[in-house]
Each structure stands twice: as structure tokens, then as C-alpha cells.
Amino acid sequence: MNLKELMKESLKYTLRDWKMLILVGILLTLASTIEEIHITHETLAIIFLILSLLLLLIEEGYRAKIIETTLHGNNMPPNLLKNPKGLIKEGFYEVIILVGYSSIISGIIYLMLYMGFNGSIYNLNFIIAVTLLSIFCTIFLICFLIAPINKAINDDKLIHAFKIHDLLKLYHKMGLSNAICSIILGITGFNLVVAPILNWGILDTYKFFEFLISFLLSPLILLFTTRFLSLSVKEVADKEIKTIND
């Protein structure tokens, strides 16, 4: 598929089941709302924290299910209400990937800040080091976006989510336009869907607009971006299988 076909197919997939969109919207709204509730009572705070984590696991598990069904050729969004335990289990692995990459990227950023506070920013070695660290940070960020998909196409083995060389090869085989679009959509999707649940989002809007984003926009972005990334990787994987068979 070319870029236009990928966009068209992803949009059709997203709008194919409006009931699922509503359910996903409710899930994301609950998750982002609970995260912003400030509770002083210790017991209630723990309960809300556990509930927030469960909703995050379900959201990430649903994302994993979209990836899985797309790779298997299914053209309908998966049922959010079917097998919630399975979604939580899948979500747990997705969160491990999230935490793993977040830790690496945070470590690189911390190292750059440490160097900035403890050395001259005009020193040539410092400039070279920060440039290299920035490149590494960018590489890990873009690899994180398709890491769950690479795990899915390799028998769901978690180690494949962290094989940087394989992930970069997938981007290379997508083609420049598809790769750039995948990166932009992936970053946008993460910031508008996952980040608000974790309270990491860069958006600082009024509550009404936050509600609209969580309930109306986030479900669309979740399904569209995940479908687009999955289809892009699926096409690469299918071509490799065809080449091997030929």
C-alpha cells in the first residue's frame, strides 16, 4: 500500500464500529479523569491508583489486540468487552515496553542535563556528546513507537520489542513517506491517548476541551494510529515472507 491507501484503510477501520469507539472513549475518559482526581485519604488514594493502573493496562491491552488482529488480517476493531483478563495481561507487557523505553530516554536526558550543569556548553567535546545523546534519544523514541508491533510479529516475544536494529530496519523498509507519517502519527497518538492517562501530556487545556479530547478525539486517534502503524509493519513483514517463499 502507498501512503494514501494506508491512510484511507486506517480511517475506514477506525469508523467501522461506532459502538467500539464510544466504549473506548468512555475507557479513556475514565482513565484520564481518575488520574486528575486529588485524594488525601490514603485508602481511597490507593484504590484510585489501582483503578487507574487497571484502566491503563486495559487501554494498552486493547492497543495490543488491534495490532494482533491487524497482523492476522482482521478488518474489524476488536471487542473491548471480550476477555478483559486477556487485555490486562497483554497490557502488562505493553507497559513493560513503555517503562523500558521511558527509562532509557529519561536516562539519556538526565545525562545531558548533568553534562550541561557540570561542564561548559561551548566545549567542543560537550557539543559532540550532547549531539550524539540527542541522536540516541531520538532513535529510542521512534523505535518505541513500533516496538509492540515487532513483538507481535515475532511470536509475542518481549525481547523483540527492544531489538533496535530490527526496528530501524522496519522503518527503512516502510519507505520514507510511510516511515515519517508513522513517526508523526505515533508521537501524536501517544501524547493524546497514553500521556494524559499518565499525566505526561503536553496539553494544558480547559477541562471541557480535555473531556472532548478524551471522549471524542482520543478513541479515533488510538484506533487510527495503531491500525496505520500495524498495517505499515504488516506490509513489510508480508513482503519478507513472500520473498522467502519465492
PLM regions and their residue ranges:
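Low-complexity, intrinsically disordered extramembrane tails and loops of integral membrane proteins
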Residues: 1, 237-246
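Interfacial aromatic "cap" segments that immediately flank transmembrane helices
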Residues: 2-31, 81-104, 143-194
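Short, small/hydrophobic-residue-rich motifs at membrane-helix boundaries and re-entrant hairpins
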Residues: 19-73, 94-114, 134-138
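Selective recognition of hydrophobic, aromatic-rich stretches within alpha-helical transmembrane segments
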Residues: 42-72, 122-161, 196-198, 203-240
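Juxtamembrane helix-boundary/capping and inter-helix hinge elements in multi-pass membrane proteins
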Residues: 72-74, 173-174
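A cross-kingdom feature marking solvent-exposed beta-strand/loop segments within repeated
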Residues: 74-80
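Short, tandemly repeated low-complexity microdomains enriched for cysteine and small residues
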Residues: 109, 193-194, 198
